[in-house]
Amino acid sequence: TGKLSDIVVEGLDGHKFSLEYTDGKIVLNLSDTRDSESCVWTGEKGSVWDLMSTENFSSSDKMFVTGDELTFNDDATTTNVSVAEDVTPGNLYFKNNKKVYSLAGKGSILGEGSLNVEGTGTVYVKNTNKYSGGTNIKGGTLIPTTLANKDGLEYGSLGAADNTITLSNNGTLKVTAGMTASHPIVLGEDGGVINNTGTLILNGGIKKGAGKNRDLYKMGAGTLQLNSTADFDVLYINQGTVYDFQDAHFSGKTIVLNGNKVVLQASNSIYSSNSDNVNIEVPKGKSGVWYPDGRCDYTGKLTGEGTIDIYATWIRCPFNGNWSKFEGTINAKRGNKNAYEPVFDFNNTYGIPLATLNVDSRFTKDYSFCTNGKSFAIGALSGTGYISNGGNFGSGTNTLTIGGKNTNFEFRGSINGSSVVKNGTGIWTISSEDVLANAKSLKIVDGVVKLNKAAATASMTGPTVLYVQNEGELRGVGCTYGVSLLKGGILRPGSNAETAQTNNTGVIYIVKNLNAVAGSSIYVNKTKADSISVNAYTGSKTPAWAFLKVGGNAVLNGTIYVTYKDTWTPAVGDYVRILDCAGSISGAPTFELQALPAGLEWDTTPFLSTGTIRVAVSTGIKEVGLDGGSFKADVYTIGGFKLTSLMTTKANLMSDLKNRGLAAGTYIVRTAQGGIKVTLK
């Protein structure tokens, strides 16, 4: 006894048959069949795809027979296809552009044929299949429910684990759940897309086929985990994460971080040492995150104009490659402890002259951003971390040239053991004594270093003499050790640029000496009569003058520019402070002085003794003839009483007045060309 339905018939795949029980016998009936044809799915009779039963095809009998070449396009009435039993077609071609197709059902697609997606539309494959001719995604999107792997799932939606999936013409393989696949992936001409939302683990590897532009595009928020070697022309990570789990790296390849915070992660295998010359590009407007192998020599290029977060993941990961063409932002970060605390080893002299380097606060004295004794350029510098001249791959006094990106920036961390050169036209703001406290030196050759801490009492420019030269400028309020102002160098107390010079207030305190050679420039300013401005409502006090305070000596042979704001009304006897100098003032400076109101002129004679220049009565004639050699002078009191007459010269005037027994005070000296006010001390 038993049921016919319990009998399993083998070896007749692709043939229509039936079983019947007659006269005590089990009879196997085979149906006649036509030759295979090329036909199109119509779906006129519904969704069922079966063998020689349902008239849903454009074939001569409107049914499907084994070996038929099938095309699925936008002309079908029904696009939800139910595979009712095992079927063995020749090849399947999905040429839908507008309609969405879905293959489902209890039956499987068998045989040696291939499944080809050639339109621009979407195809879902939800059933389990066993065809072996490969899957070719030449456009559009193919979404399988399952993928086969050699660790538990023999067959999936796209056949067995060794059934190849080929991506070309920018076709998309989309996976909407986490899974593991052992299918080999081949990239054909114009490459393809893998779009996954969960974690897709590829054990079968990725290799290049024939053609050009065999690029792989990673889409979707999920992680694409590569457990075998991946070969491609270019990998574009547009979304999500690519995890190089197999530790084989991408030597010589180019990876483009082409999205928003997309991630490239290497297996952090600290027990094996590797070398990788992978090239990374971050286009303008894009951002990415890179977790490199913590024990690998990276020698590839970094290019682009976007933003990249690079994590230090261990202690033996030197970045030796040429990043000099990168014009974006590098956020240097520390990863989590992995046996040892990670450090960042920048280990080359190519530098990053066009990039902004942002050093994270987690880089400390013990776990630093290391420059390994290499001298190189940094386009702009920001962040709050610790930069060391040492490292695992070298040490020694190096030179960091900072500013060539020609942008304004501020760094709140610290530079240690390195000599520093400021270049570029931008402004580097320093707001703490700590930034350069342990640097070897600072030289400003272009642009501006702006001090931004009025209360500073220790040097903000390093523990040695600051050199300012070429087109460099020291500006702001704060403290510096000593200043050597060379040709082209500018010293400007106050926070404003030349265009707003008359608004400048505040003091630059020079602990030691100031030396300004010919061709250098010093700018000072006065905004009010008193040096301190008091707010009438709050009582708060702010500086009203911009000048220099020198703890040592000042030797000045450059040009001194004196300006004032219209909130100060100059009067006879007023003065402008240029220097408050504890030591001596010497030299032969040239003065460029803002014009005074009519009837007044500047008197620079007190400068070398007092660090000030004064406002005097003007005759309208330069120096009232005092620059013409010997002249006769009549001396009067302020009240107009004549005291004496004498022959003198400009150089000897003050001493000759004293020799006449005149007491300290203010007098009027008249010549044939006019008169001036002089003050004896």
Tell where the protein language model's regions lie, with residue ranges.
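Extracellular beta-strand/loop-rich repeat segments of large surface/secreted proteins
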Residues: T1, K45-D50, V193, T199, ...
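Extracellular, surface-exposed repeat/solenoid domains
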Residues: T1-S31, S58, T79-E85, S382, ...
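Acidic glycine-/aspartate-rich tracts in secreted/extracellular proteins
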Residues: G2, T33-R34, K45-S47, D61, ...
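Extracellular repeat-rich scaffold modules on cell surfaces
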Residues: V27-D61, Y93-G159, L187-S251, N274-D276, ...
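C-terminal tail/sorting-segment detector
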Residues: K253, A664-K681
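Residue-level detector of functionally pivotal "anchor" positions at catalytic/ligand-binding pockets or at interdomain
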Residues: I402, V615-D634
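Terminal processing/anchoring signals of secreted or surface-associated proteins
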Residues: T619-V624, V635, G640, Y667-V669, ...
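Glycine-centered tight-turn motifs at strand-turn-strand junctions
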Residues: K642-G661
